[in-house]
Amino acid sequence: MSPRDDIPDLKGFDGDGEGSVQVHDSEDIGLDVGGARVFSVYGKGGIGKSTTSSNLSAAFSLLGKRVLQIGCDPKHDSTFTLTGRLQETVIDILKQVNFHPEELRPEDYVTEGFNGVMCVEAGGPPAGTGCGGYVVGQTVKLLKQHHLLEDTDVVVFDVLGDVVCGGFAAPLQHADRALIVTANDFDSIYAMNRIIAAVQAKSVNYKVRLAGCVANRSRETNEVDRYCEAANFKRIAHMPDLDSIRRSRLKKRTLFEMDDAEDVVMARAEYIRLAETLWRSTGEPGLTPEPLTDRHIFELLGFD
């Protein structure tokens, strides 16, 4: 028995063949997001993508947008600062109904979070087994079946680590813009360079374009800015390494629910500005950076 056998194809949809959901074209999936603007958030593992995604979703909602955030990580902690709890995953809920999606209602797997942000956690198979990308693909199908992607202004995909192969690249097939979360250090920038290459490859056949990067948990931005200048890329936000952001995670809240300390107010303003920048970016030509070779990055940022 394959480790993936515990996650069968969703009944009620055309069969795709084992594992094929993760590499299908968007036309095959038939995803219709209506007029929603779709953003995929990528970055090195542990860089703060979920914190960035949740506060970005909150900022969009405060700008009057209807927002849906989709966590694409087996840890299923993408949305807990929006909802105040760890949300049950789509895959676990499907198991409860023996993988009969027609028995589910949106409220069975969608939780309303801060300021009306709708939250979904795709989940994933146990560690070391199955295909997480397959789970993401099936979640997208379920959202399509219930027309949830059509009834929003903004969709935010919070994607696992810096994995941009197969299924975890699937959000790029539907995204208008990809946002990369990085930090002012070599490893984070190295991961960003590889993500840029993956997004550029997808952009040949899909509408996705790069929006820019966020320098996160960083006092300075000099290394990020040096890379951006060399690769013709752009930093569009800077989130310093603030203790208030760490405390908000511990309190299971977005920054917009914290007390009005000076650093909190500053961070909120930066997230609002980021949301406004991303919203405008979909009506403008996307960035077209040139990813650097490994040797070039080492020479640019590595040790002397």
Curated annotation (Swiss-Prot):
Pathway: Porphyrin-containing compound metabolism; bacteriochlorophyll biosynthesis (light-independent). Binds 1 [4Fe-4S] cluster per dimer. Mg(2+) binds at S50. The keyword Protease does not apply. ATP binds at G46, I47, G48, K49, S50, T51, K75, N216, R217, P240, D241, L242. It catalyses: chlorophyllide a + oxidized 2[4Fe-4S]-[ferredoxin] + 2 ADP + 2 phosphate = protochlorophyllide a + reduced 2[4Fe-4S]-[ferredoxin] + 2 ATP + 2 H2O. Its cofactor is [4Fe-4S] cluster. It holds the Pfam family Fer4_NifH. CDD domains: Bchl-like. GO terms for molecular function: 4 iron, 4 sulfur cluster binding; ATP binding; metal ion binding; oxidoreductase activity, acting on iron-sulfur proteins as donors; oxidoreductase activity, acting on the CH-CH group of donors, iron-sulfur protein as acceptor. Its EC number is 1.3.7.7. It comes from the Bacteria. Keywords: 4Fe-4S, ATP-binding, Bacteriochlorophyll biosynthesis, Chlorophyll biosynthesis, Iron, Iron-sulfur, Magnesium, Metal-binding, Nucleotide-binding, Oxidoreductase, Photosynthesis. [4Fe-4S] cluster binds at C131, C165. One of its GO terms (biological process) is light-independent bacteriochlorophyll biosynthetic process. PANTHER family: LIGHT-INDEPENDENT PROTOCHLOROPHYLLIDE REDUCTASE IRON-SULFUR ATP-BINDING PROTEIN. HAMAP family: ChlL_BchL. Belongs to the NifH/BchL/ChlL family. Component of the dark-operative protochlorophyllide reductase (DPOR) that uses Mg-ATP and reduced ferredoxin to reduce ring D of protochlorophyllide (Pchlide) to form chlorophyllide a (Chlide). This reaction is light-independent. The L component serves as a unique electron donor to the NB-component of the complex, and binds Mg-ATP. Homodimer. Protochlorophyllide reductase is composed of three subunits; BchL, BchN and BchB. This is Light-independent protochlorophyllide reductase iron-sulfur ATP-binding protein. It comes from Rhodobacter capsulatus (strain ATCC BAA-309 / NBRC 16581 / SB1003).
